[in-house]
Each structure stands twice: as structure tokens, then as C-alpha cells.
A protein has these predicted regions:
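Nucleotide-activated chemistry modules centered on ATP-dependent adenylation/adenylyltransferase
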Residues: 2-8, 13-401
Length: 401
């Protein structure tokens, strides 16, 4: 009996040619594991293609709700954004796919797992650190680090030689990754950081010129930092994000063009479309501004940066991520309320925020005199606060004499 390998399969160019390559070079039975994270593909066609290219079995796992509730919303609560712009759409999808890939391998008695990530990118790290954390006994096969193919053009040649139909072409050479949270675009003209993305690069979000000429207001409801409603209607996580993707996209919200620092030390350029995510991270920040105490809010910014790094670097299944989750969960116990945003041609403006846990008080923040704040108290506060400054100034004056 041949050994079995479980391939994380998408039906794109890379994984389409990996099935016959694995059979040719390893003589494995190839089990294709398709993780549905909302990429919008015709899954029946993907399954048929996997069988047609040599898979002995195809397993489809609906991971959409788990992807959002256990990964995306945790990052949202943490305020995790990598290098100021990237909302980690691909980074968050890899651990949930790898987790289920390992589960399939254990269930099917496979001895190896495989992925289609290149040897230059971050995804190889994300998949393989997950494998090592969850099933260190499994052999890992990374064809891009083994085969003689050097480019996507070489992959297209291989596909043509083996009669494998692929959507990519020499004219459409972008590498794309899509899920419920975002679409990423790399390669082609984007490899030159001086090139603007072509209009055809963007798949989901309208340009500002094509967006409506009137603003659209959207109300968000949160419970303990988790989004639960849009415009007063409670929705399940998948429906909520899908609706916000539609709303953000038609208002030109969520396009990102980023030169980022990969974990492997290479700078890369990617374009991302995250319409719903951009709306949610903005609304969540506004609600936190209303409800979090100052020191917690400031410290949480550091936690958000570290959380984003952990996710981006593939360190999801680590004690530190779990520890950060515990801190974040504590900060979110009062993040319940509503936020209203106004969207207009790519801009997002907050127009209202409410919460029963709000720490904002008009009797303290307003300019009118009130019983709860005696302005005369500020004099003593400032003198105590300024003591080090006065001491330093006197010392310098003594030295100058």
C-alpha cells in the first residue's frame, strides 16, 4: 500500500500541479484537503479538478464560521494590524486550514502533509509551524523548495505539458488569495513598487470615482468586543462579514497598497481588499475609545502590535498567543455598545458611539463648571507633576553659575 499525503488544496496554479508532481516524485496517494474559508470558488469544480489531476480522495471542510469566530474576531478584539495597514487576512486563514489538514491526516492514516507555498514567502512558515505544533511526527513536503520550477511561468508550462487546466495565464500572472476577510494580490506589475495597481487588479472594491455620490451610514453592534449586528439586525458571523464586505466595497472602502517586511527578511509588495474588516476595526476602535480606561487602552496598543506579529509570523499555536488572548479577553468585557460610521468614496468617519459602559462623561469633559471637578485642584496636580522639571531646571541653573 502506498503511503498517503494530505495536500492543502485550493485548485489554483500551484496546488493543481502539485498533485501529479507528488505522484511522480513520491508515489504517494494524494488526499486533497479543501478548506472553505469563504474564497467563493465553485467547490464542486475544485473537487472535480482535484480528482481529474490524480487525487485519490478529496475532503472539503467548511471552516468559515470557525475562521471568523476563533481567529479573525480574536485578532479584531486585539486590534491586530501588521505594519499599520495589513489586517492579516491570509495570515489568519493559514492556521485554521493547517489544523484541519492535520486532523484529516490523522483520520486517514497519512504519514505526510504538503502545501503549495513558495520558499520565499511567509505562508510556508505559517503552515509548517502549525504542523510542528499539532503533529510533529508528520513529514512535511514543500514542492517549491524541491522542484526545478523557478517561476509561475514554469508552472504554467508544467500545467500545459500535463494537460492541467488553470485560470492563470502569462497575461494574468497575479497570485491571489481570497477568503471572507480579504483578497490579496501579488506578482505581475505589482512586483515593481513604482507601479500603480492596474484597475483590473482590484476584484471587489470599487474605485472612489465609481462609488455613490452620497454618504452611507452604517450602525454596528458589539457585545464584549464581538460584532453581532448591522443596522440593528443581529446576524451570524458569516452573514455579518459578507454584508459588510458588500457595503464597504460599494463605497470604495478597504483598498490597501503595502510594502511589507516578510518574516523571512524580504520586503514584498502586496495589494489587499478588506472592506468589511476595515469597517469593523474602525468601529471597534471607536467603541474602545469610549469604554477603555487610559492605561489599559495605551498598553493594549502594544499588545495589538505583538499579536499582529505573532499572527503574521505563523506563531498562532503558541503559549504567548494564548496568554495575549487572556489579556485581550479581560479588556473586552465592557466593549459592548454601538457605533455609527459614515462612508463616502473611500473615507470612513465616525458619527456616533454609545455604550452603557462608557467612561465619557459630559459633566467632566464639558466646559461648564460642575460639582464633580473643582478646577482649582488642577494647580496642586500640576505642581506635583512638575516637580522633576523644576528640580532639573534648578540644577542646570546652578551648573551655569
Amino acid at each position: 500500500m502506498p503511503e498517503k499525503v494530505v495536500l492543502a488544496y485550493s485548485g489554483g496554479l500551484d496546488t493543481s500541479i502539485i498533485i501529479p508532481w507528488l505522484k511522480e516524485n513520491y508515489s504517494y496517494d494524494v488526499i486533497a484537503m479543501v478548506g472553505d474559508v469563504g474564497q467563493g470558488d465553485d467547490l464542486e469544480a475544485v473537487v472535480e479538478k482535484a480528482y481529474a489531476t490524480g487525487a485519490s480522495k478529496v475532503v472539503v471542510a467548511d471552516l468559515r464560521e470557525e475562521f471568523l469566530t476563533e481567529y479573525v474576531f480574536r485578532a479584531l478584539q486585539a486590534g491586530a494590524v501588521y505594519e499599520h495597514k495589513y489586517l492579516l487576512g491570509t495570515s489568519l486563514a493559514r492556521p485554521v486550514i493547517a489544523k484541519h489538514q492535520v486532523e484529516v491526516a490523522n483520520r486517514e492514516g497519512a504519514t505526510a502533509v504538503a502545501h503549495g507555498c513558495t520558499g520565499k514567502g511567509n505562508d510556508q512558515v505559517r503552515f509548517e509551524l502549525a504542523y510542528q505544533s499539532l503533529a510533529p511526527e508528520l513529514k512535511v513536503i514543500a514542492p517549491w523548495r524541491e522542484w526545478t520550477l523557478k517561476s509561475r511561468e514554469d508552472c504554467l508550462d508544467y500545467a500545459e505539458q500535463h494537460g492541467i487546466p488553470v485560470a492563470a495565464s502569462r497575461e494574468k500572472i497575479h497570485s491571489r488569495d481570497r477568503n471572507l476577510w480579504h483578497i490579496s494580490h501579488e506578482g505581475g506589475e505589482l512586483e515593481d513598487a513604482g507601479n500603480a495597481p492596474l484597475d483590473s487588479t482590484w476584484q471587489l472594491i470599487r474605485s472612489p470615482q465609481e462609488a455613490p455620490d452620497h454618504a452611507e451610514q452604517v450602525a454596528f453592534g458589539f457585545e464584549k468586543g464581538i460584532p453581532i449586528s448591522v443596522n440593528g439586525t443581529k446576524l451570524d458571523p458569516v452573514s455579518l462579514v459578507e454584508l459588510l464586505n458588500e457595503i464597504g466595497a460599494r463605497n470604495a472602502v478597504g483598498r490597501v497598497d503595502l510594502v511589507e517586511n516578510r518574516f523571512v527578511g524580504i520586503k514584498s509588495r502586496g495589494c489587499y481588499e478588506t472592506p468589511g474588516g476595515t469597517l469593523l476595526i474602525t468601529a471597534h476602535r471607536e467603541l474602545e475609545a469610549l469604554c477603555l480606561e487610559r492605561d489599559v487602552a495605551h498598553f493594549k496598543q502594544h499588545v495589538g502590535l505583538k499579536y499582529a506579529e505573532l499572527v503574521y509570523f505563523g506563531l498562532w499555536f503558541t503559549p504567548l498567543r494564548e496568554a495575549l488572548d487572556a489579556f485581550v479577553e479581560t479588556t473586552q468585557k465592557d466593549i459592548t455598545g454601538s457605533v455609527k460610521l459614515s462612508l463616502y468614496k473611500g473615507t470612513v468617519a465616525v458619527v456616533g458611539r454609545e455604550s452603557e459602559y462608557s467612561l465619557y462623561r459630559t459633566d467632566l469633559a464639558g466646559f461648564t463648571m460642575g460639582e464633580n471637578y473643582d478646577q482649582k485642584d488642577a494647580e496642586g496636580f500640576i505642581r506635583i507633576l512638575g516637580l522633576p522639571a523644576r528640580s532639573r531646571a534648578r540644577a542646570r541653573m546652578e551648573i551655569a553659575r
